[in-house]
């Protein structure tokens, strides 16, 4: 439910993807989430460890997905879907304000991500 996802973000939130791309504002973060949703199907998040302190939550997770859609590239080109399923590890750090995401940073090993989905040699 994209409305529910949108409402998780504060209007002025900042999101940073593993490649360092910064998304500013609710609409930009929702658009990024939708991009990932169209690129990968069968997302399954296994939260291995969650730690909270004050207004910050850190989530260590394993993510399994199948690459069924194109991966858009910064230059406007795209990588075709591989159809491969892969499990990778990621870490998300979330700062909250009034129950909404104020800042979100996601870290993952993109080299193993790209190799696992068959985008580059392993």
Which residues fall in each region the model found?
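C-terminal and inter-domain tail/linker signature
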Residues: 1-122
């Amino acid at each position: 439910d994209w409305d529910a996802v949108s409402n998780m973000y504060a209007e002025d939130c900042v999101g940073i993807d593993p490649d360092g791309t910064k998304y500013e504002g609710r609409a930009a973060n929702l658009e990024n989430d939708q991009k990932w949703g169209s690129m990968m199907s069968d997302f399954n998040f296994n939260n291995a460890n969650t730690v909270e302190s004050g207004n910050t939550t850190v989530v260590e997770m394993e993510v399994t997905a199948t690459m069924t859609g194109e991966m858009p590239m910064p230059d406007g080109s795209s990588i075709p879907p591989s159809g491969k399923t892969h499990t990778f590890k990621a870490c998300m750090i979330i700062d909250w304000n009034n129950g909404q995401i104020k800042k979100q940073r996601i870290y993952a090993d993109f080299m193993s991500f790209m190799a696992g989905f068959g985008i580059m040699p392993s």
